């Protein structure tokens, strides 16, 4: 069988799996059985083999500094059943995209303190309260694209000290029901496009320090005056397209020092009312109105 396989990558994976199966069988039938199995590095293929282990083994996966666990497009219940038997010491990336899960409460015992990237795209998540249970002080990227989230009030109780990218696009958020300040000192990209946003007045509860890209396109927003109250000095790209905005004069009052992309397409903008603003913005911005 191995002679017919030309791809070095596939061949390597198959050989690796065979070796791991051999190791597991040796341990399984050894009278002096080990209670803990240390595996130097984890990958998806090895994870599948690990599942064959007897339940009484406590697995300790020790990876390199940047330990990545990819479990995309799997059954959430089955994933949690086996992840909870594994002790992660240095997990920095966790990909649970298309995993058919609605929360992460089953993983509360897992050490995610070093996690930097968490991908939960395309699941059935409607509540984000579970995030509070994890110590995610080192998290840099949180992606919740394509879920059923309608309420983000839980952000009031979460400290995003190092978060740089937050993707909440294509959810069901209508109103930003936040009444307390939420600090995003290092956030550079915020994507809330293609939700059901009508009112973004509560955006003034967000404290941005380094925001460079903001997407709120594809909603039902009519009033964008709140943007004047935000710290957008570092903003480079602003996407407001596909909303119901008719008055954009507030944009002329904001000091967009580095803005080079402003998308206002597919909005019922009043050209006469906003002519001065359109002219002012058009002098310095590459793409602003069509």
Go through each PLM region and give its residues:
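Cullin-RING E3 adaptor/co-adaptor recruitment helices
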Residues: 1-75
């Amino acid at each position: 069988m191995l002679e017919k396989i030309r791809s070095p990558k596939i061949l390597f994976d198959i050989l690796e799996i065979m070796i791991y199966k051999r190791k597991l069988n040796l341990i399984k039938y050894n009278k002096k059985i080990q209670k803990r199995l240390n595996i130097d590095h984890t990958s998806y293929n090895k994870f599948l083999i690990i599942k064959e282990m007897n339940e009484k083994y406590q697995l300790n996966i020790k990876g390199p500094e940047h330990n990545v666990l990819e479990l995309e497009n799997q059954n959430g219940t089955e994933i949690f059943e086996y992840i909870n038997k594994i002790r992660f010491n240095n997990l920095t990336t966790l990909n649970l995209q298309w995993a058919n899960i609605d929360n992460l409460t089953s993983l509360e015992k897992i050490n995610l303190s070093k996690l930097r990237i968490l991908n939960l795209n395309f699941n059935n998540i409607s509540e984000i309260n579970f995030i509070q249970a994890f110590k995610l002080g080192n998290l840099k990227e949180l992606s919740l694209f394509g879920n059923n989230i309608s309420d983000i009030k839980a952000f009031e109780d979460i400290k995003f000290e190092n978060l740089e990218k937050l993707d909440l696009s294509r959810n069901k958020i209508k109103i930003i029901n936040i009444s307390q300040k939420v600090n995003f000192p290092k956030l550079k990209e915020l994507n809330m496009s293609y939700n059901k946003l009508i009112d973004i007045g509560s955006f003034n509860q967000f404290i941005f320090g380094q925001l460079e890209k903001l997407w709120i396109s594809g909603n039902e927003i009519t009033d964008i005056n709140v943007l004047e109250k935000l710290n957008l000095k570092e903003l480079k790209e602003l996407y407001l397209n596909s909303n119901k905005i008719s008055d954009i004069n507030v944009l002329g009052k904001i000091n967009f020092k580095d803005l080079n992309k402003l998308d206002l397409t597919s909005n019922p903008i009043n050209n006469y009312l906003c002519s001065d603003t359109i002219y002012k913005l058009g002098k310095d911005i590459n793409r602003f109105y069509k």
